[in-house]
Curated annotation (Swiss-Prot):
<dbReference type="GO" id="GO:0016918">
    <property type="term" value="F:retinal binding"/>
</dbReference>
<feature type="short sequence motif" description="Nuclear localization signal">
    <location>
        <begin position="21"/>
        <end position="31"/>
    </location>
</feature>
<keyword id="KW-0813">Transport</keyword>
<comment type="similarity">
    <text>Belongs to the calycin superfamily. Fatty-acid binding protein (FABP) family.</text>
</comment>
<dbReference type="GO" id="GO:0005829">
    <property type="term" value="C:cytosol"/>
</dbReference>
<dbReference type="GO" id="GO:0001972">
    <property type="term" value="F:retinoic acid binding"/>
</dbReference>
<dbReference type="GO" id="GO:0005504">
    <property type="term" value="F:fatty acid binding"/>
</dbReference>
<dbReference type="GO" id="GO:0019841">
    <property type="term" value="F:retinol binding"/>
</dbReference>
<dbReference type="GO" id="GO:0005634">
    <property type="term" value="C:nucleus"/>
</dbReference>
<protein>
    <recommendedName>
        <fullName>Cellular retinoic acid-binding protein 1</fullName>
    </recommendedName>
</protein>
<keyword id="KW-0683">Retinol-binding</keyword>
<dbReference type="GO" id="GO:0043005">
    <property type="term" value="C:neuron projection"/>
</dbReference>
<dbReference type="GO" id="GO:0070852">
    <property type="term" value="C:cell body fiber"/>
</dbReference>
<keyword id="KW-0963">Cytoplasm</keyword>
<dbReference type="InterPro" id="IPR031259">
    <property type="entry name" value="ILBP"/>
</dbReference>
<dbReference type="InterPro" id="IPR012674">
    <property type="entry name" value="Calycin"/>
</dbReference>
<feature type="binding site">
    <location>
        <begin position="132"/>
        <end position="134"/>
    </location>
    <ligand>
        <name>all-trans-retinoate</name>
    </ligand>
</feature>
Amino acid sequence: MPNFAGTWKMRSSENFDELLKALGVNAMLRKVAVAAASKPHVEIRQDGDQFYIKTSTTVRTTEINFKIGESFEEETVDGRKCRSLATWENENKIYCKQTLIEGDGPKTYWTRELANDELILTFGADDVVCTRIYVRE
């Protein structure tokens, strides 16, 4: 079983602004969000299939607790409440489908994958995919 536990810092990010656009975030808020999310700090605790993930930026801190295969509540990248279900896509990759609790919007998901001692995080909104690569601190 892969070990996601540890603290992670972002090395690169692609398409974050495009992702926010696809989610309908206005230009002013996108500018603030892109600046704030340029140096996120991620802490992951893992006990088998049980995960705790805390992501901190200068503007916002999010925390999620979940177990693979059990639905849980969290927020989409743009802050809307959703019901999520994380599953193992393969032995090193978690896929999490998000379903909005209220309202309409693009189909969203995230993945987290360990590869070559890097954490590869993707956020998807319909056809737009943001990829962020993290390294251990």
